[in-house]
Amino acid sequence: MTEIDRSRAFAKDVKRIVVKVGTAVVTGKGGRLALGRLGAICEQLAELNSDGFEVILVSSGAVGLGRQRLRYRQLVNSSFADLQKPQMELDGKACAGVGQSSLMAYYETMFDQLDVTVAQMLVTDSSFRDKDFRKQLSETVKAMLRMRVIPVFNENDAISTRRAPYKDSTGIFWDNDSLAALLSLELKADLLILLSDVEGLYTGPPSDSTSKLIHTFIKEKHQDEITFGEKSKLGRGGMTAKVKAAVNAAYGGVPVIITSGYAAENISKVLRGLRVGTLFHQDAHLWAPVVDTTSRDMAVAARESSRKLQALSSEDRKQILHDIANALEVNEKTIKAENDLDVAAAQEAGYEESLVARLVMKPGKISSLAASVRQLAEMEDPIGRVLKKTQVADDLILEKTSSPIGVLLIVFESRPDALVQIASLAIRSGNGLLLKGGKEARRSNAILHKVITDAIPETVGGKLIGLVTSREEIPDLLKLDDVIDLVIPRGSNKLVSQIKNSTKIPVLGHADGICHVYVDKSGKLDMAKRIVSDAKLDYPAACNAMETLLVHKDLEQNGFLDDLIYVLQTKGVTLYGGPRASAKLNIPETKSFHHEYSSKACTVEIVEDVYGAIDHIHQHGSAHTDCIVTEDSEVAEIFLRQVDSAAVFHNASTRFSDGFRFGLGAEVGISTSRIHARGPVGVEGLLTTRWIMRGKGQVVDGDNGIVYTHKDLPVLQRTEAVENGI
């Protein structure tokens, strides 16, 4: 569940809401109504109305809609000769008159479908000079709200005496943004929401990648920092008008949030207290953080520190890892105490047993982590390694070398030990790192992050590894494709899918760990028992644990299958069957073969032969890790060649699919994708390549006077290069 932002806590007490939708939200291309977008907003407002909120809508769009209709009418009534003449600009007030009826007709139709009554309320600025008018307006709106009617306000542009350019000549209101602010004050609203075509107020034009979204507007801080871009071509005011209206309302006592009308459920998110859009509040200056560090700042700092790390010698980088390993062991008691608090809190909160199991750092875990960090330190330095060397032409040498990817964003759930593995891999590979762990491991992640960053020398800086503590920062981070180079999610299918659908940054990872063990008819019973038990029970919550047991059909006749099942049942494993196995073994039939239990449970099914097992794995598996138990080498080779998974084993537990056990030192995750890295991802998976060319003044000059040799040259190992003085 997404956490409530503390600065938005007032939202829980909101009763009366004014929502203003701008022309850019109401209309789409060509000035026509954006039916889908507007319909989604109406559904949110109807739901709020049903939940007891008092909803007031201020809607722009009449002029734009009317202009579109009048242009069509003008086209229909024009001759070909008329169309060759310069076209006169349509009168805005006539457009407003025509468009208002169409706009209101849409609202009536849409809200009627949602069983909500609406009322049209057209006002002009001059009306508000009359005290009696304002009093009557308030009484009328209150009466409507008591009957669950939604008033729909708009300025009556058709009869307004104001002319373009629109200015605040009267001090009352000058567009629908300022009208919404005025109404929120007059009608004593608890909140004003201004819906725009952008996510909120930025420090510069939203199209500029360096512009930052301002989550909380602080007048004293931001009013001189903001550079406004061009306003919408459809509307009148743009962001400048919205900010001015928001400041007026906020300092009059009504909180304001500017957010996108394009994003689904944004109104509902605002009222749940989530950090969307930009908040304007009269007390905002009291909430300003001591250090205003944005997601972009964290990513940029991580990149700068990574460049300092790469500039160190191989021995210095190795020493950092040894220092981290030592620091982990020295602080073992403190780490364990914080982890115990996380585990106790998770159990008290009623988290699933599988999640709690992943959260626990068992005795000896810190020592094991320290050992893996030391193993990683002693591996060959991966940075700057020459992978290929080519003589392009005489005295023109080209080298393909290994290089860090840049800045990594790792989002992981539950397992705090993953933080240590990921951080050590990032340091060894020379990458900057941003980490976001699950809130259930908050204390464990915080202490591990502190221990690790304290061990990093000042010449590099602790900002090499940033710890993201608020879930609300993740959407911001996923937009930073110019400063974050790779995202690696480690967690549930839902988490991985959400991240893949929310970013342009390349994503490396797997959504499911549905691992199979297939026991062939020639498999040895004792070996099968050991492998199946280990694959399921060594760590049931692991992504490389067995989730489906496939058995050759011949084994159901000789008692082999019964013996296997007995072993699992006596060890507390809950069994679910496919159609054949459930009938044979009298166990519940599984709802889906594509299911990751992450607990002491698994699916069992009987297949015809190795080809049936392969087909089952391809249809229902996740391309993670699959194993065959057989003494028939020919059958084993068929399985190993044809199963299209990241890791395929013969007579070995799926639990071996692990970076540490593969000798990678540690792993940042397991990838089931087919691009860049596959299987357990260690240091190699966090590297890319660069091309280094050394010449003696050669130029292309149309390839005249140069003879390409493209001769492969021997690549010296690093130790050989040092010995030869290269």
Swiss-Prot record:
Its source organism is Arabidopsis thaliana
Q: Which residues bind substrate?
A: S60, D157, N176
Q: Which GO terms describe its molecular function?
A: ATP binding; glutamate 5-kinase activity; glutamate-5-semialdehyde dehydrogenase activity
Q: What is this protein called?
A: Delta-1-pyrroline-5-carboxylate synthase B
GO annotations of cellular component type: chloroplast; cytoplasm; plasmodesma
InterPro entries reported for this sequence: AceGlu_kinase-like_sf (IPR036393), Ald_DH/histidinol_DH (IPR016161), Ald_DH_C (IPR016163), Ald_DH_N (IPR016162), Aldehyde_DH_dom (IPR015590), Asp/Glu/Uridylate_kinase (IPR001048), G-glutamylP_reductase_CS (IPR020593), G5K_ProBA (IPR041744)
Q: Which NCBIfam families would you find in this protein's record?
A: P5CS, PRK00197.1, proA, proB
**Mind listing the UniProt keywords for this protein, alphabetically?**
Amino-acid biosynthesis, ATP-binding, Kinase, Multifunctional enzyme, NADP, Nucleotide-binding, Oxidoreductase, Proline biosynthesis, Transferase
